[in-house]
Amino acid sequence: DDSRLLLWGNANFADIGMDKELYDGHVVDAALTDTAYIVLLDDGSVAYSGDKATSLLATDIPAGAKSGVVSIAATANSVAALKNDGTVLTWGVTTRGEGAIPQFSAKPIKIEGGRYHYTAVLEDGNASSWGHNRYKQINVPAELTNDSVDVKNIFTGYYQNYAIDANGKMHTWGLKGFLLGTDDLGRDIFARLVNGGKMTMTI
């Protein structure tokens, strides 16, 4: 309720320093990449809240992200801001298609980020995904793009998406799982073992 952001965990390889005097009491939301994060402030602006001033997330913040932002999201190496007019801005490392924003059927009202992709719920109840598609995580089911289903909310995992419709039904697309499951970073255990990786498993 006091608009503060609290962080904990191992910060050895992450930039999670924060200028408390600048942002405390004004944080509405936060979006985390693999090693850093941005915050949405109560004035509708986006700020890079780490302490590495040379980070692309800090130096490449678009001018349009300084006001009117209503939703933020992040992938492993990029971040996105959704403005109140439906404009989506992305910056950071977008080499996997994260910056290839599609033509929407209506104004986006919420955005979520996976490992290398983004998904948005639109004002007309449809959904849209873009970015990396190795596991078909941007192949939105037809019923979520042709006005057949009224999507009310979305959530993303590393390589999958979950949409909740007006009737409370969940729709999913993307990675359906690996033969031997995943490790704690979402990687294919079977592929790791085949390629000489080692790990302990309980069967």
Please annotate each region the language model reported.
Residues 1-2, 42-43, 84-85, 124, ...:
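Acidic/polar residues in short coil/turn loops that connect beta-strands
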Residues 3, 34-35, 44, 76-77, ...:
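Short coil/turn segments that connect the beta-strands within blades of beta-propeller domains
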Residues 6-24, 47-65, 89-105, 131-147, ...:
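Short glycine/serine- and acidic-residue-enriched loop/turn motifs that recur at repeat junctions
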Residues 7, 36-39, 48, 78-81, ...:
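Conserved core positions of repeat-based scaffolds
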Residues 25-34, 68-76, 107-115, 150-153, ...:
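Repeated scaffold domains used in trafficking and secretory/extracellular systems
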Residues 166-179, 189:
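N-terminal, non-cleaved signal-anchor transmembrane helix
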Residues 189-203:
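Transmembrane alpha-helix signature in integral membrane proteins
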